[in-house]
Amino acid sequence: MDGHADKNNEVETAGGHRARLRRRLLDAGPKAFHDYELVEYLLALTIPRVDTKPLAKRLLHDFGGIGPLLSASADTLRREGLTDPTIAALKIADATALRLLESRIKDKPVLSSSDALGEYLHAAMAHARVEEVRVLFLNAKNMLIANEALWQGSVDEASVHVREVIARAIALSATAIIIVHNHPSGDPSPSNQDIRLTRDLVEAGRHMKVTVHDHVIVGVEGRTSMRAMGLI
């Protein structure tokens, strides 16, 4: 009987804590929450009658922060023992945040929204564990036509990638592009391959009347602009 009573007390305590979190969220907004409380609340949506604070803190510790946690793949999260409903709750939060940031660079000239663009690119790519190359295709007014991840992996095969990027730009009737890729190491410094790819893209684009505005490298330590470095 005592064990059953203790269990009921735990459930009631967890329920009361969640109600207090919900009230604080509605009254003060998400800025009043620590990262672990945001994750705790997300976990509580799919893990009933359990105190999710310890799990939230463990996940943040294991992944190194809320960004790497939310951007982790479903398979990686499963290896942490999370169920699919819980993984879906984390991924929908990640997708919503990215969609919000992406909305800030739509319907306006991308080059005049550099801060918003940087925030979006960092959120979308900085915490990825594999290298990804993304291209922003722009029209003559530098408005975003398409935002596409073209490939994952090394940029070593520069000539193949150059043809793919320029061909896609022509197919979309884009007049300019911004190429972006991440460094999973965290260091956004360009490699020799990055510099070579940039120069090859600029040259190929010139022949096909596609302007390469920039090549941005993103890492958890920051981001690097090839144009700002004088490489374009």
What are these regions (language model features)?
Residues M1-T76:
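Long, highly charged, low-complexity intrinsically disordered interaction regions
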Residues K31, T175-A176, T211:
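Short acidic/polar active-site loop segments enriched in Thr and Asp
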Residues T83-D84:
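Small-residue hinge/turn detector
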Residues A97, L101-L121:
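Long, charged amphipathic helices and adjacent flexible linkers at domain junctions
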Residues Q152-S191:
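Short HxH-centered metal-ligating active-site micro-motif
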Residues R199-I232:
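Divalent-metal-activated hydrolytic enzyme cores
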